[in-house]
């Protein structure tokens, strides 16, 4: 019994041309895809190298300060006041309290101003709002020593060195970060919520307080924390507004010590114990700034995910 084998007919002229074009397009697409994958891989490698090179100085700084400063930490370091030169056993309790007072007062001064200015910027448009944004951007780029000199000329010359003059200088330093951060946070609130609140008959002030501000609280907290992290480590404004003291003081009208002062003065001392105190103060300051920055960035990341 014989079997016949059926063979597929050869493609005609048009079909052959179509098949050839399809094979050509598929080959070109595969080559393009391979090239794009190679480019994407190269870009990822370059970005990874850049990120690694960026993290090297940070890791070296954190490791070096930790190595030099962690040995100074003790109960006495956090509870005692500084001792005279050459006498070991001193601490930075007055500097810790002074930094909390100065930066806390600066935060109290800058927070309402930054919030009100940000509310004005999201409600008003025009040359005045643009000028305020431009001024905030310029102020954020000014060297902190100029802000300290400004506070010295306006406050210290007419009064005396004090904690409140240092707080005013740091508040000016924090303001541009708060203004721009608060504005961006409140812009994440949808316009529909504004319109819904006004349509219900609520006053604009009530809508702002109950809808806009309440809806942007995570972003406002982030902006304030990042501004505080900027002000905590500044030394130049303090040099013009208050003076280093070994006394424990909580008066806003008197000179008050701060952690940057301890780092600046003890770090340049010829005595080893004071140098060790400076490294310990640097470690405490570094940890504090890192904690504030991490908390602020975490809030910012959550706000971004929520807005999406």
At which residue positions do the language-model features occur?
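Generic hydrophobic transmembrane alpha-helix motif, especially the helices
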Residues: 137-173
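Interhelical loop and adjacent transmembrane-helix boundary motif
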Residues: 85-86, 238-287
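Transmembrane-helix boundary motif in ABC transporter permease subunits
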Residues: 106-136, 149, 296-305
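Transmembrane alpha-helical segments of polytopic membrane transport and secretion proteins
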Residues: 1-51, 296-308
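Transmembrane alpha-helices
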Residues: 107, 181-182, 204-241
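Periplasmic/extracellular loop-to-transmembrane helix junction in inner-membrane transport proteins
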Residues: 26-49, 63-106, 262-276
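Amphipathic cytosolic juxtamembrane alpha-helices at the membrane-cytosol interface
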Residues: 125-129, 133, 190-222
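C-terminal transmembrane helix and the adjacent membrane-cytosol boundary/short C-terminal tail
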Residues: 183-187, 222-225, 265-308
């Amino acid at each position: 019994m014989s079997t016949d084998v059926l063979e597929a007919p050869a493609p005609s002229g048009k079909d052959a041309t179509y098949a050839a074009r399809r094979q050509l397009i598929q080959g070109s697409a595969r080559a393009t895809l391979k090239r794009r994958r190679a480019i994407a891989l190269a870009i990822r490698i370059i970005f990874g190298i850049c990120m690694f090179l960026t993290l090297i100085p940070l890791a070296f700084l954190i490791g070096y300060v930790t190595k030099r400063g962690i040995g100074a930490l003790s109960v006495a370091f956090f509870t005692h006041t500084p001792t005279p030169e050459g006498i070991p056993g001193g601490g930075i309790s007055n500097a810790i309290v002074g930094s909390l007072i100065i930066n806390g007062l600066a935060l109290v001064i800058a927070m309402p101003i930054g919030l009100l200015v940000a509310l004005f910027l999201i409600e008003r448009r025009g040359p005045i709002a643009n000028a305020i944004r431009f001024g905030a951007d310029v102020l954020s780029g000014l060297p902190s020593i100029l802000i300290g000199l400004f506070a010295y000329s306006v406050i210290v010359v007419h009064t005396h060195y004090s904690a409140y003059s240092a707080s005013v200088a740091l508040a000016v330093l924090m303001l541009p970060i708060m203004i721009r951060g608060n504005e961006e946070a409140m812009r994440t609130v949808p316009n529909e919520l504004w319109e819904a609140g006004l349509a219900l008959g609520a006053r604009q002030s009530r809508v702002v307080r109950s809808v806009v501000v309440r809806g942007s609280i995570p972003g406002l907290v982030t902006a304030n924390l990042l501004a505080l992290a900027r002000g905590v480590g500044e030394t130049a404004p303090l040099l013009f507004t208050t003076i280093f003291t070994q006394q424990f003081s909580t008066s806003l009208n008197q000179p008050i010590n701060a952690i940057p002062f301890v780092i600046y003065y003890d770090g340049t001392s010829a005595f080893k114990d004071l140098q060790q105190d400076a490294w310990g103060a640097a470690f405490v300051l570094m940890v504090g700034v890192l904690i504030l920055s991490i908390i602020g960035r975490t809030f910012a990341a959550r706000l971004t995910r929520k807005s999406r």
